[in-house]
Amino acid sequence: MDKITLRKQIREKKRAMTPEEITAASEKLTANFLATDLYRQAKTIYGYLPYNQEVRTVAMLEQAILDGKRVAVPKCYGDEMRFIWLDDLTQVAPGYANIPEPIADEPIADDPSALVLMPGLAFDPQGHRIGYGGGFYDKFLAAEPNHPTLALCYDFQMLDHLETEEHDIPVDTVLWA
């Protein structure tokens, strides 16, 4: 199946989720994520703020701040994405494509070992990922390739196999619920 068709099908499944289903899966993923060695060992989390029916990440990012970890979330500048440090997850506003992002343009996060949480539409057991089509994470990780990466998704987003392209960068770990 081509990426356009796959993206459309997954978006339709996400739109069909009830708020209760999103909350239940997000709570399970939060607990699972906070129990991982990746989380426990990370000093810095490059997270993301949820958009539409994405996994709700705010509780995990708030816990990371409470646990003394540094947290940054992405902000888009044209076709590039940079992570901006955030101490307060309320200091955000709709940005690129109405996705929540920091109001401030700085300070720009600069931890090459930060754990990067990645959204996406579809994943497979080999870590292949189909994103939303902007290429923001692929470009970021091509420029900063040493980050450990972890994707969060719903069970229907986990597929047996995805066709990928040369520029697609796989994730190290995928958690789903």
Segments from the language model and where they lie:
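N-terminal active-site beta-alpha-beta segment that forms phosphate/nucleotide-binding
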Residues: 1-111
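Conserved phosphate- and dinucleotide-binding cores of soluble alpha/beta proteins
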Residues: 79-177
